[in-house]
């Protein structure tokens, strides 16, 4: 979500949804657990809400920074805000930046430009208006599309230099992002406020890419495709694709929230509605890659001629509509006891080139919070799950949305006016219609794998987090999660995802030298695996448990000028981020230094 408005994307086409530059946002909010009351489509894991930067200063202020790092990274950011009227009731802010970097991957280069302009205005004592425009362009040369072949035909595993890439130098992946947005807030009746958020966004992309998906013959390095036993023409070992398209989103969310009195007690109420329309239109031209075109993979270095492309044809033209009405109230049953109940009604419809699908769903929510004392509280909550998905069945149709229930029981504490908080929670998630790969390509597709819906998936676990100030000079965030997920026959679901994770980040300002701050972080995850059924037997891909250690130091040279150094993957750990039939290595050790000036 961005400013509370959700965006749903088609994972078959890489539109760069994860590439929005963080310099454009003030903060990132993470809401754990099913979130259908917020978004209309409840994801059982979490929702990330990106909050845009706004013009809040009534005087001219700004920040400029320059960063240099490994793989020829250079990055420059300017963030300026100023009053636009003498009384400061109308203010403006612009954020602009440029980044260029190579990679540990051979031939890879990325260039990014971004800009955001926003005007915030106080139209009176009770009315405010925000309006803005955002632009990003990302050009990537020699991007990877998938990974490196993991398996030899005898079941043994391959290993490669982390710099190895299958991408030829003619491949690219370019994207343009344009967004306009507006927010109006109206306060009335003392404790009440109405808010309207609206946005229009367009994303365009154009790419020519290549992938390799095959097994390696150890004798000579030749490649053998995974689908050759399906008949003539299926012996390909990869493919090239010229893909382009556009996604347009129009969305509006209108809600009011405030307090009301009932039975001598003060309560809170929120009422709202939302509408969104999203169109995804993509065109493509594909060609299969056969073993003789690559030769021995042992000597292949990305020297592959560009495809003689056929004209593009329409591959997808889908329009998704979502209409929602929602309400929630926080009822004060007693001084220490609060009941939160709510529901969201959603009408969701998708129209494709060949068929339509429509779902109506009511997402209820109920929670009970008990304040044990000034610092401790306990809670219990329930909500349902309704999550449209973009996986296709064997006939090429979308699977029905995931449905289910989410239960949670927790204990929270709050210390020193929220400077330090802790959370302990246990949860249980029940889901139906969960997509599971069949490993079989969809007939007539460009290699898309068919999925089937699986009912009776159950996940249960526990998580703990402590976040905030341990002392005036010491900040720490520590979190740990453990869960299990099984289907209705007791088999592990998505064992390629870590069941146990531990995250620690800390920073310390030296009392004897307050200009100097040092810190670091550790991310640890347990062993993961994935079984792949191949023509040569069932092969298991595994990644053992590992920890990544990062360090940083910041020195405040003057009141306005600071320098920070970052060292990522301190021990240069080699690890695999893609536990299936291909290998995708994670980022090796790298360093960067950033100089920042505030005024």
Give short role names for the model-derived ranges:
Residues 99-103, 116-187, 202-247, 292-318, ...:
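Acidic/polar loop-and-plug regions of large Gram-negative outer-membrane beta-barrel proteins
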Residues 185-187, 193-199, 203-209, 371, ...:
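Membrane-embedded beta-barrel scaffold of Gram-negative outer-membrane proteins
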Residues 430, 524-533, 551-599:
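C-terminal beta-signal and adjacent terminal beta-strands/loops
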Residues 5-32, 51-52:
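Short acidic/polar hinge/loop motifs at secondary-structure boundaries
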Residues 334-336, 452-533, 571-574, 594-598:
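Gram-negative outer-membrane beta-barrel transporters
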Residues 180-203, 236-355:
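Face-selective signature of the C-terminal outer-membrane beta-barrel domain
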Residues 120-122, 247-249, 265-278, 314-431, ...:
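Structural signature of Gram-negative outer-membrane beta-barrels, strongest in the C-terminal barrel
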Residues 9, 24-26, 37-117, 123-127, ...:
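Outer-membrane beta-barrel translocator/receptor signature
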């Amino acid at each position: 979500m961005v400013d509370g408005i959700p965006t749903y994307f088609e994972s078959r086409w890489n539109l760069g949804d994860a590439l929005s530059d963080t310099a454009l946002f003030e903060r990132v909010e993470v809401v754990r657990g099913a979130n259908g009351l917020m978004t209309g489509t409840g994801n059982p894991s979490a929702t990330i809400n990106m909050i845009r930067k706004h013009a809040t200063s009534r005087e001219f202020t700004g920040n400029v920074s320059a960063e240099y790092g490994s793989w020829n990274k250079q990055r420059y950011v300017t963030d300026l805000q100023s009053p636009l009227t003498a009384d400061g009731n109308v203010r403006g802010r612009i954020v602009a930046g440029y980044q260029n970097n190579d990679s540990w991957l051979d031939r890879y280069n990325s260039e990014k430009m971004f800009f955001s302009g926003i005007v915030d205005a106080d139209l009176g004592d009770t009315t405010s208006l925000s309006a803005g425009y955002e632009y990003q362009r990302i050009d990537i040369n020699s991007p990877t599309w998938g990974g490196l072949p993991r398996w030899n035909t005898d079941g043994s595993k391959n290993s490669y230099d982390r710099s190895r890439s299958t991408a030829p130098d003619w491949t690219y992946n370019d994207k343009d992002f344009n967004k306009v947005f507006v927010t109006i807030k109206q306060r009335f009746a003392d404790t009440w406020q109405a808010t309207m958020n609206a946005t229009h966004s367009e994303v365009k992309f154009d790419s020519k890419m290549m992938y390799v998906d095959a097994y390696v013959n150890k004798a000579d390095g030749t490649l053998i495709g995974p689908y050759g036993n399906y008949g003539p023409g299926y012996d390909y070992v990869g493919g090239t694709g010229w893909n382009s398209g556009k996604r347009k989103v129009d969305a509006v969310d209108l809600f009011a929230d405030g307090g009301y009195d009932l039975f001598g007690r003060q309560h809170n109420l929120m009422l709202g509605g939302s509408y969104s329309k999203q169109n995804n239109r993509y065109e493509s031209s594909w060609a299969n890659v056969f073993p003789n075109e690559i030769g021995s993979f042992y000597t292949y270095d990305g020297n592959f001629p560009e495809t003689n492309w056929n004209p593009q044809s329409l591959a997808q033209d889908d329009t998704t509509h979502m209409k929602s009405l929602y309400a929630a109230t926080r009822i004060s049953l007693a001084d220490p006891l609060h009941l939160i109940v709510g529901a969201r009604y959603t009408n969701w419809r998708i129209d494709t080139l060949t068929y339509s699908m429509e779902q109506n769903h009511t997402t209820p929510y109920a929670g009970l919070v008990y304040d044990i004392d000034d610092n401790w509280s306990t809670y219990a909550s329930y909500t349902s799950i309704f999550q449209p998905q973009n996986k296709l069945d064997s006939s090429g149709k979308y699977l029905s949305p995931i449905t289910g229930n989410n239960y949670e029981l927790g204990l929270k504490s709050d210390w020193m006016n929220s400077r330090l908080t802790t959370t302990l929670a246990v949860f249980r998630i029940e889901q139906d219609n969960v997509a599971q790969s069949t490993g079989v390509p969809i007939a007539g597709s460009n290699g898309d794998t068919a999925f089937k819906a699986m009912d009776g998936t159950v996940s249960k676990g526990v998580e703990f987090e402590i976040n905030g100030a341990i002392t005036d000079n010491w900040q720490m965030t520590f979190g740990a999660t453990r869960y299990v997920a099984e289907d209705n026959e007791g088999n592990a679901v998505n064992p390629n995802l870590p069941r146990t994770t531990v995250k620690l980040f800390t920073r310390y300002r030296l009392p004897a030298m307050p200009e100097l701050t040092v810190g670091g972080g550790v991310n640890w995850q347990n062993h993961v695996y994935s079984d792949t059924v191949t023509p040569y037997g069932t092969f298991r891909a595994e990644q053992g448990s590992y920890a990544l250690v990062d360090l940083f130091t910041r020195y405040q040279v003057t009141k306005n000028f600071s320098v920070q150094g970052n060292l990522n993957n301190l021990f240069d750990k080699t690890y695999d981020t893609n536990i299936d039939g291909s290998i995708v290595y994670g980022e090796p050790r790298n360093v960067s230094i950033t100089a920042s000036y505030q005024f």
